[in-house]
Amino acid sequence: MEQMRVYIANLGKYNEGELVGAWFTPPVDFDEVKEQIGLNDEYEEYAIHDYELPFEIDEYTPIEEINRLCNLAAVSYTHL
């Protein structure tokens, strides 16, 4: 299985015309996301702008769900 990763962007900054985001490898730690892409009281929302995963997600898939699905994919792959 290829490396799974997601590109998470600061949605507030994106809407202001500035691309602030980073690639993360699951399991994604939300505190790390907040620190790396500048989520705070002013910029609270994020969006998934790209991904390399063996399943489909959308831009508003919660990080917890991405982590859960990645765990299932990894477990399934090891049992092949």
Enumerate the language-model features and the residues they cover.
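Polar/charged, Gly/Pro-rich intrinsically disordered segments
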Residues: 74-75
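Conserved small/polar residues in nucleotide/adenosyl-binding loops
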Residues: 78-79
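Short, intrinsically disordered low-complexity segments
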Residues: 38-71
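N-terminal ordered "arm"
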Residues: 1-43
